[in-house]
């Protein structure tokens, strides 16, 4: 069953931010997705500041 696990990429290695139930040396597939903060940063250059602030208020 697929699981979503957040990880940080440091020095060429993906480091999970939570405990994972894997055996040493087990191979897995990774699907890399941008986080919402990364998406907002990308579009903030294209969106009026007032519109961005309204969007962030609605997301809370």
From Swiss-Prot:
Q: Which protein are we looking at?
A: Putative antitoxin AF_1087
What the record says about family reads:
Belongs to the UPF0165 family.
Q: Which UniProt keywords apply?
A: Toxin-antitoxin system
Q: Does the keyword rRNA processing apply?
A: no
Q: Which residues are listed as membrane-spanning?
A: none
**UniProt xrefs under SUPFAM superfamilies:** AF2212/PG0164-like
Keyword field contains Protein transport: no
Question: Which Gene3D superfamilies does the protein's record reference?
Answer: AF2212/PG0164-like (4.10.1150.10)
Chain's role? Possibly the antitoxin component of a type II toxin-antitoxin (TA) system.
* Origin species: Archaeoglobus fulgidus (strain ATCC 49558 / DSM 4304 / JCM 9628 / NBRC 100126 / VC-16)
